[in-house]
Amino acid sequence: MSRGIIIIGSGFAARQLVKNIRKQDAHVPLTLIAADSMDEYNKPDLSHVISQSQRADDLTRQLAGEFAEQFNLRLFPHTWVADIDADAHVVKSQDKQWQYDKLVLATGATAFVPPIAGRELMLTLNSQQEYRACETQLRDAQRVLIVGGGLIGSELAMDFCRAGKTVTLMDNAASLLASLMPPEVSSRLQHHLTDMGVHLLLKSQLQKLEKTEAGIRATLVSQHSIEVDAVIAATGLRPETALARRAGVVVNRGVCVDSYLQTSHPDIYAIGDCAEINGQVLPFLQPIQLSAMYLAKNLLGGNAPLKLPAMLVKVKTPELPLHLAGETQRRDLSWQITAESDGMIAKGMSGEGQLRAFVVSEDRMKEAFALLKTLSV
């Protein structure tokens, strides 16, 4: 008798995988185990909860029980997996164990919190659960410090500002979105945030946080300090690899998988934010959707290597949205930038004259798909 497929995790990657498996096989035993409630919510919505006055429970799209019934699953919510015996094909919690034929790690990633004095005062917004824990503090806060000027930090800064809060956005780098694109490209968003009233502290490093009668004092390495009501860490995500390590699976930044989403153990796979696919961590929706399609085939006996096309990444800053694609982080590209009142097109060209990356904003985003077709990958 088939012991079936076990998926550890309940986020977007896990759910996409379930849907793709069930399109091909209605009966293979499927078990999901996760530490949270397993209710479905749309994670990108977390970037807009404050301006839209949403509570954590407002984000719920489907209850876990409904999902289980719809897709014929066994669910084990609020269950911490303690260990994996890869040789015996057994997953263990504190008081249960499950046997599997194939195991999928969809354990996601955790928000990185800088190791500074007072780090326990920092909030993170990487899940519905985390937002539920701090939503009252964030709604009541008037002065907010966001540490990290990347994708999530920039989105949150705009959202909190649109909600009428006093926002300070801090980053070690000299420009926003520094790991994604050069300053001459990100400057349009940077100027817009400043015009909205966001106070930027660039080339700045946080040294410590202290609770005060008035709120929280944030002290920089420069010894400059500001008083705020809440501090949010938006300093990146770290793939959750602890379980994989305990199972003896090879990990690097993430759980290492090949083009078949297979780990170093032939019956263990990984998908989503926890996975490192041929050396790349791709915590974006489109690669996860494609990964789920291919992995479903492979779990059911197929042999389908994942092929990722050029894909768009969306920066969800509603007053100045951006789409980007290609190797925007490369430092050897020559950027051709056309900026008009209705938006910007920035093309990153190689020395051979090939389009290797682009960023488009506002009304010029409609040109993104045409540019994708000419992108050299």
From Swiss-Prot:
Where does the UniProt annotation locate this protein? Cytoplasm
Record's Pfam families? Pyr_redox_2, Rbx_binding
Root EC class: oxidoreductase
- Enzyme Commission code: 1.18.1.-
Keywords from the UniProt entry: Cytoplasm, FAD, Flavoprotein, NAD, Oxidoreductase
Which reactions appear under catalytic activity for this entry? 2 reduced [nitric oxide reductase rubredoxin domain] + NAD(+) + H(+) = 2 oxidized [nitric oxide reductase rubredoxin domain] + NADH
Does the keyword NAD belong to this entry?
Answer: yes
HAMAP family recorded for this chain? NorW (MF_01313)
Instruction: State the protein's name.
Output: Nitric oxide reductase FlRd-NAD(+) reductase
The record lists the lineage as: Bacteria, Pseudomonadati, Pseudomonadota, Gammaproteobacteria, Enterobacterales
